[in-house]
From Swiss-Prot:
Gene3D superfamilies: Cytochrome P450 (1.10.630.10)
Transcription recorded as keyword: no
Localization annotation: Membrane
Positions in coiled-coil regions: none
Expressing tissues: Mostly expressed in the developing stigma of floral buds. Weakly detected in leaves, stems and flowers.
Membrane topology: Single-pass membrane protein
Cofactor section: heme
Protein name per Swiss-Prot or TrEMBL: Cytochrome P450 86A22
Enzyme Commission number: 1.14.14.129
Molecular functions (GO terms): heme binding; iron ion binding; oxidoreductase activity, acting on paired donors, with incorporation or reduction of molecular oxygen, NAD(P)H as one donor, and incorporation of one atom of oxygen
Pfam family, one: p450
């Protein structure tokens, strides 16, 4: 009996090892992460949890842009746990465009986000997604929405963001710039989404119930990704752990949004009787002939907030960090800003600071757009994304992807591969986005630069994002010089969005434009008349300054 049991165990182990050898041999990328029996590549995943995106990039470099791995190497479960990881632009075009219908968000993604986002555009596939996409696309192409974004952004910059930075400058206190940017973009996106300002960016940096509840709901939702589906569903059913926080937070979000929608219905009714007009996204949907349920309208607004809030603020955080350590790039950005303001606002620099740049001025900032794009190439706001495989398929590089498996396309890695961006791919060089004469912004292939997604799901708010980021960046750099506070370490936070782990603590000092105006004068942009020095201090023009082509300098 004992002998037969032993032989049976040996036979089972031998059969498993033969199966394991077969499946690992069939996988693309033998130089990828080490595969272990039963646990697959999970040990490597855990070991590199604090440098996940770099670990994925290292594996992709070793495997020429694509590899396959399995989180759980158990027969009958392996296919579902098989993940194809790629950053090859040819593969990305195939997944995101050519065979778009074969690679939806998939059931896992939708189950995780359903409680928060329902069947909103961010979380849906098929006809549901297509209907919302077409409806939203009509709104995003209107000049009215862009003008509304310009108003919300500039109002927040002038009345809140700049005063907070100026106060920090006067007091000599460092600020967590990432936190300020998150508050700023949250207020802006709420204003644009449903016309209500939560005012999270105020001098006292208050806690807002809706913002806090939305953040907690998002965090709890993302936590579902790191555990098997049956585990978080069981915790939800039993009311355990973060599922309790998620449920409570969703109630707060729902109450807030219900109040917003009911109030807006009354306001739109009053508008028909001569009341004020609203141009936010929610109002524009409510004015349509189609009758949308309140739940649908709520999901429209929440999807828009989730898609537009963290992405812009995170990109700006990495931008200011990169620019603060690259004085050459900072100088070129300032030369561009000052040159344009001299043309549009005249010769007195004090007038440059009275109002933030309007979007006609922002549109001309080509080098600034290049610097922001270069930031997103190296530090994309969403570093990794995934798709579900409907039917067996072959990627352009020959990789077989079976039905039921998943594909992760690494946006972070795409920007860091020599075979895609050249030997200098790890350098911060905005010039790679400019034409040879340096005057025009050059649009890159969307499958090499996937920060805004690509194909039918390409980001509808791309132009609005650039408008917001350029407006904020120009306002800050024109007034202040930023430097990372001594002792503060900038690290990536491992989440779906590429936050800085401990924020971005920076010292704020006055911007001295003297070298910038001298640079402009040297290259013949403006003419010098006489002179001393100029220092912008708290937005106040200092007396005793020189004039450069009439520009106080």
């Amino acid at each position: 009996m004992e002998v037969s049991t032993t032989m049976m165990i040996v036979a089972i182990v031998a059969a498993y090892l033969l199966w394991f050898k077969s499946i690992t041999k069939s996988m693309k990328g033998p130089k990828g992460p080490t595969m272990w029996p039963v646990v697959g590549s999970l040990p490597g995943l855990i070991e590199n949890g604090n440098r996940m995106h770099e670990w994925i990039a290292d594996n992709l470099r070793a495997c020429s842009g694509t590899y396959q791995t399995c989180i759980c190497a158990i027969p009958f479960l392996a296919r579902k746990q098989l993940v194809t990881v790629t950053c090859d632009p040819k593969n990305l075009e195939h997944i995101l465009k050519v065979r778009f219908d074969n690679y939806p968000k998939g059931p896992t993604w939708q189950a995780v986000f359903h409680d928060l986002l329902g069947e909103g555009i961010f979380n849906s596939d098929g006809d549901t997604w297509l209907f919302q996409r077409k409806t939203a696309a009509l709104e995003f192409t209107t000049r009215t929405l862009r003008q509304a974004m310009g108003r919300w952004v500039n109002r927040a910059i002038k009345n809140r963001f700049c005063p907070i930075l100026e106060m920090a400058q006067v007091q000599g206190k460092p600020v967590d710039l990432q936190d300020l940017l998150l508050r700023l973009t949250f207020d802006n996106i709420c204003g644009l989404a449903f016309g209500k300002d939560p005012e999270t960016l105020s001098p006292e940096l208050p806690e807002n119930n809706f913002a806090t509840s939305f953040d907690r709901a998002t965090e709890a939702t993302l936590h579902r990704f790191i555990m098997p589906e049956f585990v978080w569903k069981l915790k939800k059913m039993l009311g355990l752990g973060l599922e309790v926080s998620l449920n409570n937070s969703l109630k707060q979000v729902d109450n807030y949004m219900t109040d917003v929608i009911n109030t807006r219905k009354l306001e739109l009714l009053n508008h028909q009787n001569g009341g004020p007009q609203h141009d936010d996204l929610l109002s524009r949907f409510m004015k349509k002939k189609e009758s949308y349920s309140d739940k649908f309208l709520q999901h429209v607004a929440l999807n828009f907030i989730l898609a537009g809030r963290d992405t812009s603020s995170v990109a700006l955080s990495w931008f200011f960090w990169l620019v603060s350590s690259n004085p050459r790039v900072e100088e070129k950005i300032l030369v561009e800003i000052c040159t344009i303001l001299a043309e549009t606002r005249g010769n007195d620099t004090s007038k440059w600071l009275e109002e933030p740049l309007v979007f006609e001025e922002v549109d001309q900032l080509m080098y600034l757009k290049a610097a922001l794009s270069e930031t997103l190439r190296l530090y994309p706001s969403v570093p990794e994304d995934s798709k579900h495989v409907i039917s067996d398929d072959y990627l352009p590089d020959g990789t077989f992807v079976p039905a039921g498996s998943n594909i992760t396309y690494s946006i972070y890695s795409t920007g860091r591969m020599k075979f895609i961006w050249g030997e200098d791919c790890l350098e911060f060089k905005p010039e790679r986005w400019m034409s040879q004469d340096g005057d025009k912004f050059q649009v890159q292939d969307t499958f090499r630069f996937v920060a805004f997604n690509a194909g039918p799901r390409i980001c509808l708010g791309k132009d609005l994002a650039y408008l917001q980021m350029k407006s904020i960046a120009a306002a800050v750099l024109l007034r202040h010089r930023l430097a990372v506070a001594p002792g503060h370490k900038v690290e990536q936070k491992m989440s779906l969005t590429l936050f800085m782990k401990d924020g971005l603590v920076m010292n704020v000092t006055p911007r001295d434009l003297t070298p910038i105006l001298a640079k402009i004068e040297k290259f013949g942009k403006v003419e010098s008349c006489a002179g001393e020095h100029h220092l912008i201090n708290n937005g106040i023009h200092q007396p005793g300054s020189i004039a450069v082509n009439g520009i106080a300098a």
